[in-house]
C-alpha cells in the first residue's frame, strides 16, 4: 500500500474479502494515512448460499475500521441482513435494511438484490433517498464473482470521474454484458466474460482521451 500510494496514487480503492481482523485494521490505517478517495467496500462476510466466510472478530473489525471509511458499501442480501439486523425478503425490506446501514456508517449503500430476489434489481440508498437500478435476470450458470466484479467496476468508474449514480449504472451495464456473453470455462459455476467488450470500450475511451489531450496541447500552444 505504501508503494502504491507513493508512486501512482489511485483515484479509487476497492476492498473485497479480508479475513483477518489485524489486516483489516492495518488497511484502514493506511487508507486514513494517505487520505484515500472513493473507497468502495464490498463487505464480504456471507456467501449468497448463506455460508459464513470470515470469523466474528474480522466482522467486528470490518464494522469498526473499514465500513466508516467507505464512500459506498455493496452488500448482498445476507450481508445486508447481518449489517442491519433485519431480514430481507422483499424490495421493501431492502429499503428498510439499507437505511440504518447508511446512517450508521455515513455512506451510500448499494444493496444487491440479484441473488435472492426475482430480478437483478439493486437499491442505492444515501442521504435518505432511494434509487433503483433495474436489470433482468440472465440465464447463465456462470455467475461466479459477479459481486466482486460489480464493486470493482463501480470503483473503476469513480476513478474515471463519473458520479456514483453513473458509476453504478455503467457497472450494471458491464455486468449484464459480461453475463450475456456466456463464457463457459471448466466445471461448475465459472466466471463471467470480463473481456466481452474490452476492445471497443478501450478504443472508445482512448479516442476520447487522445482528443482531449490534443485539445489541451493546442490550448497550451496557443497560450505560449
Language model features by range: what are they?
Residues 165-224:
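Charged C-terminal helix
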Residues 87-94, 159-169:
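Short, charged, surface-exposed loops that flank catalytic or proteolytic processing sites
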Residues 130-144:
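Short pre-catalytic strand/loop immediately N-terminal to key active-site residues, enriched for Gly-Thr
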Residues 81-82, 140-164:
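Short, small-residue alpha-helix embedded
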Residues 56-130:
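Conserved phosphate/ATP/ADP-binding segment of small-molecule kinases
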Residues 1-48, 52, 200:
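Conserved N-terminal subdomain of the carbohydrate kinase-like
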Residues 19, 45, 79, 114-117, ...:
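Glycine-rich beta-alpha junction loops
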Amino acid at each position: 500500500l505504501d508503494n502504491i500510494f507513493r508512486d501512482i496514487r489511485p483515484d479509487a480503492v476497492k476492498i473485497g474479502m479480508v479475513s483477518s481482523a489485524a489486516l483489516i485494521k492495518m488497511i484502514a490505517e493506511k487508507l486514513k494515512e494517505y487520505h484515500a478517495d472513493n473507497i468502495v467496500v464490498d463487505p464480504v462476510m456471507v456467501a449468497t448460499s448463506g455460508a459464513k466466510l470470515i470469523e466474528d472478530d474480522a466482522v467486528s473489525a470490518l464494522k469498526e475500521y473499514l465500513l466508516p471509511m467507505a464512500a459506498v458499501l455493496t452488500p448482498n442480501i445476507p450481508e445486508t441482513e447481518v449489517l442491519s439486523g433485519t431480514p430481507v425478503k422483499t424490495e421493501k425490506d431492502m429499503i428498510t435494511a439499507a437505511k440504518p446501514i447508511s446512517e450508521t456508517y455515513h455512506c451510500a449503500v448499494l444493496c444487491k438484490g440479484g441473488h435472492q430476489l426475482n430480478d437483478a434489481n439493486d437499491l442505492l440508498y444515501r442521504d435518505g433517498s432511494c434509487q433503483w437500478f433495474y436489470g433482468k435476470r440472465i440465464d447463465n450458470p456462470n455467475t461466479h464473482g459477479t459481486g466482486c466484479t460489480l464493486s470493482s467496476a463501480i470503483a473503476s468508474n469513480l476513478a474515471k470521474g463519473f458520479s456514483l449514480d453513473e458509476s453504478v449504472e455503467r457497472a450494471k451495464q458491464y455486468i449484464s454484458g459480461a453475463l450475456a456473453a456466456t463464457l463457459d470455462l471448466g466445471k461448475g459455476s465459472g466466471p463471467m466474460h470480463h473481456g466481452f467488450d474490452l476492445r471497443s470500450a478501450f478504443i472508445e475511451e482512448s479516442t476520447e482521451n487522445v482528443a482531449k489531450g490534443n485539445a489541451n496541447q493546442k490550448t497550451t500552444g496557443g497560450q505560449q
